[in-house]
A protein has these predicted regions:
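Acidic, polar low-complexity linker/tail segments
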Residues: 1-23, 28-38, 52, 112-117
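DG-centered beta-turn motif at the end of beta-strands
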Residues: 26-29, 40, 65, 104, ...
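Mixed-charge (Asp/Glu-Lys/Arg
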Residues: 29, 135, 141-147
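An active-site-proximal "capping" alpha-helix that borders the catalytic cofactor pocket
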Residues: 40-52
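Arginine/glycine-rich "motif VI" loop of SF2 helicases in the C-terminal RecA-like domain
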Residues: 55-56, 146-154
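Short, charge-patterned binding micro-sites
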Residues: 62-88
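Von Willebrand factor
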Residues: 73, 83-123, 135-137, 155-169, ...
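Von Willebrand factor A/integrin I-like adhesion domains
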Residues: 158, 162-225
Length: 226
């Protein structure tokens, strides 16, 4: 089956309904090679399949994918989830986190403006970062993340993979750091799917009760969503 070009993908479906923007910010540096990147690819692709079994979530969810190693790449701009193509990410290179975080912030800001111009009410967007490495100097971009969260513009949290730099992720996300035990991303991406479903049956601005985390992920996240 031939892949669609981005020009063939509608910018939004059901514009009269509230919409949710979810951006996956994914570390594809060399240390993610082998089982980690293979599991991540399979789990991202399964996430799309799971979301699309629920008509309501499919209707309101737009997803973007940004990867980073020593460079930042927008693998997929914000796209209605039903139009996601399978990913086949390849791990290589070093880790430079700050530029990728800034790209993610800019994309979320632009998506929020797009919703406003379309007359679409937005849910608070999520940036979900997955990383196993040391990200370099993130002090400046961390301040931007904290300010945007404090102002109520987004939720930014991260999943640390085996060997991750805890100090870096906590500097960026505060308490909103999850820890993955092992390299199986299936459970956490299923959690993301169920979280999007919980958002989809809420009203924008309403506190959402999130599902329990999978057994191989540590942290209780519900206090983050006040």
């Amino acid at each position: 089956m031939s892949q669609r070009t981005f020009n063939e993908i509608p910018p939004i479906v059901s514009a009269s309904e509230p919409h949710m923007a979810l951006l996956f910010l994914l570390d594809v540096s060399r240390s993610m090679s082998g089982d980690p990147i293979n599991s991540l690819n399979a789990s991202i692709n399964k996430f799309k399949e799971q979301v699309c079994t629920d008509p309501r979530t499919t209707e309101i969810l737009d997803v973007a994918i940004v990867t980073f190693n020593h460079e930042t790449q927008v693998v997929m701009p914000f796209t209605p989830v039903a139009y996601m193509e399978p990913v086949n990410l390849v791990a290589s290179g070093g880790t430079e986190m700050a530029p990728a975080v800034q790209v993610a912030l800019d994309m979320v800001d632009e998506r929020s403006r797009f919703y406003r111009h379309a007359g679409t009410e937005p849910y608070k967007p999520w940036i979900f970062m997955i990383s196993d490495g040391y990200g370099g100097d993130i002090s400046a971009v961390s301040e931007v993340v904290h300010q945007k969260e404090n102002d109520g513009y987004l939720k930014f949290f991260s999943l640390g993979v085996e060997g991750y730099d805890s100090k870096t992720l906590h500097q960026l996300c505060g308490e909103k750091v999850l820890k993955l035990n092992g390299y199986d991303f299936t459970g956490i991406l299923d959690w993301a799917h169920k979280s999007m479903r919980a958002v989809s049956v809420s009203s924008p601005g309403e506190k959402v009760r999130l599902p329990a985390l999978p057994e191989n992920v540590d942290k209780d996240v519900n206090d983050w969503f006040d």
